[in-house]
């Protein structure tokens, strides 16, 4: 009986300790602050609307942007901001203001712009220090097809980043399950706390229409450009690669059975790879001595290098002939 009583006493004591720990967590200031800081969706919309704006070039609406500090620095997409002409921003809160380009990073389709200085701090969205994980809900403020301040919900569709080829180069981004019409490019993707976890850059489309997947630029790239405030030029081969299993069935029939590698596509005439002897539809058998079969792995390897470095490629024609080795001097992606 005494043993049973002792065990019950220990169990009651452990349960008491457990309750005290749980209560202390709920009463801890950091927990309370975090709980209070989580805005309603209505408040989140208002916060994002205050810090977002439309991009105008020569008076025409070309995309979206958003403020990322109180001094008037803001982010938008390079594929819109690069267009020549008078750059302005417009919103119900800001009115219509002139803006200037400070720096860009084509490897992330990203442009840092600056609004006119003023005494009153600008409303802005803080940029998260980490990516949102797979399945997490995210919220986009955009300007779809000339409509204003539209709030779009999505979910992060993969872990980590991937690379998509558009606007003439590979862009690093994160997939989001969401329908994002044209005009949303440059808009902020936010988490539930109102922190920027990405910037809308592109959509997965076919001639039949949107495929339900969007690409957002990772927050790390936005923070980096804001900190540097100067152009970032990643290394480029001035060509693209595609995976063998993604090719047309007739192409796959022409290549030797068991071939491993990547297919050369979008080879730029007079580009650095073309000058080194690379040809359209070549198969890249090895990269710096490694067999690489996935595009993401290839681009990550490339992005670890800097302009001026050499990349060693082992190539062959699609029918297995003309095997050769070339060295390509990497160019800056400007």
Q: Model segments located where?
A:
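Bacterial N-terminal signal peptides
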Residues: 17-26
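Protease-domain processing segments flanking chymotrypsin-fold serine proteases, especially trypsin-like
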Residues: 30-58
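C-terminal cap/linker of serine protease catalytic domains
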Residues: 34-45, 99, 122, 144, ...
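Gly/Ser-enriched beta-turn/beta-hairpin loop segments
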Residues: 43-47, 104-108, 159-174, 228-233, ...
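Active-site region of chymotrypsin-like
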Residues: 47-54, 116-124, 150-215, 219, ...
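Conserved active-site neighborhood of the chymotrypsin/trypsin-like protease fold
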Residues: 52, 58-62, 67-150, 173, ...
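A structural signal for short beta-strand/turn segments enriched in small hydrophobics and glycine
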Residues: 72, 135-141, 194, 273, ...
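PDZ/PDZ-like groove recognition
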Residues: 179, 230-286, 290-297, 301, ...
């Amino acid at each position: 009986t005494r043993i049973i009583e002792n065990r019950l006493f220990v169990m009651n004591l452990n349960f008491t300790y457990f309750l005290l720990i749980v209560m202390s967590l709920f009463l801890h200031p950091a927990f309370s602050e975090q709980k209070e800081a989580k805005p309603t969706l209505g408040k989140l919309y208002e916060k994002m609307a205050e810090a977002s704006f439309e991009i105008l070039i020569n008076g025409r609406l070309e995309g979206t942007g958003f403020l990322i500090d109180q001094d008037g620095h803001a982010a938008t997409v390079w594929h819109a901001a690069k267009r020549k002409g008078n750059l302005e921003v417009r919103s119900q809160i800001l009115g219509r203001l002139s803006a200037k380009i400070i720096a860009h990073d084509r490897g992330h389709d990203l442009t840092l712009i600056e609004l006119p200085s003023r005494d009153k701090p600008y409303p802005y969205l803080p940029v998260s220090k980490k990516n949102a994980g797979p399945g997490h809900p995210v919220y986009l403020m955009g300007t779809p097809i000339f409509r204003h301040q539209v709030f779009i919900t999505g979910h992060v569709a993969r872990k980590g980043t991937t690379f998509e080829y558009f606007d003439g180069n590979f862009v690093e981004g994160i997939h989001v399950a969401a329908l994002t019409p044209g005009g949303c490019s440059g808009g902020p993707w936010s988490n539930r706390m109102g922190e920027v976890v990405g910037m809308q850059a592109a959509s997965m489309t076919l001639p039949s229409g949107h495929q339900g997947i969007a690409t957002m630029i990772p927050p790390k790239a936005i923070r980096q450009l804001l900190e540097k405030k100067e152009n970032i030029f990643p290394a480029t081969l001035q060509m693209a690669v595609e995976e063998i299993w993604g090719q047309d069935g007739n192409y796959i029939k022409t290549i030797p059975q068991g071939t491993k590698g990547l297919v050369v596509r979008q080879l730029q005439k007079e580009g650095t790879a073309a000058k080194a002897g690379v040809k359209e539809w070549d198969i890249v058998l090895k990269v710096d001595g490694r067999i690489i079969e996935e595009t993401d792995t290839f681009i990550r390897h490339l992005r670890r290098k800097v302009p001026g470095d050499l990349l060693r490629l082992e190539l062959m024609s699609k029918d297995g002939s003309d095997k050769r080795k070339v060295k390509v001097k990497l160019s800056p992606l400007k």
